[in-house]
Amino acid sequence: MRSLLLAIPLCLVAASISAADLPKVGDAAPKFEMTGTDGKVYTNKDFLGKKAVIIAWYPRAFTGGCTKECKSFQEAGSELKAYEVAHFTASTDPVEKNKEFAKSLNLDYPILSDPEGKNAKAFGVLKDDGKAANRVTFVIGANGKILAVDDKVKTDTHAQDLAKQLESLGVPHKSAK
């Protein structure tokens, strides 16, 4: 019992440390380079000065919450595409597994793969076991700065919720160009 009481504060400290590792609104976004399920390699440089980027990290392909979240991005695709924003989901799963996952959901956007976890680590979302990412979403402005960090994702409506926030975050609407 005593060791359990000692373990609880340590877990709370570990949780607060990982939350402290997340980039904050206004910080420069971490540099990233990840392969998408469409075979292309995406980097932060591809979007810098051009458009905002959404990267929605999820733990594992073919699991309940991750499936709901990816479907949300599929269903809200037209709402997101109305803005000057590129949107991706991302995980530490290998590219082939994410390709199978994307195909099973008939997704029309790329899932980014980070099998070594180096990008997830840079974003502060890599779980302690080093094998999966925590569910956290980043909206990165065209200037490369973090506009929003969401670590309380509602998987069923996540992309719709993001689409509603884009204007207030200063992401231009395509018709405004």
Where are the regions a protein language model picked out?
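Positively charged n-region of N-terminal signal peptides that target proteins for export
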Residues: M1-L5
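Bacterial N-terminal signal peptides
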Residues: A7-A15
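N-terminal "domain-start" segment that seeds a small globular fold
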Residues: S18-K45, E167
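Short loop/turn microsegments at loop-to-beta-strand junctions
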Residues: A29-P30, A52, N134-V136
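Short, internal strand/loop/helix patches
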Residues: M34, F88, N98-N134
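Short active-site neighborhood of thiol/selenol oxidoreductases, capturing the structured segment around
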Residues: N44-T67
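Structural microenvironment flanking redox-active thiols in thiol-disulfide oxidoreductases
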Residues: F62, T67-L105, G117-N119
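Thiol-/selenol-based redox modules, centered on thioredoxin-like
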Residues: A133-K177
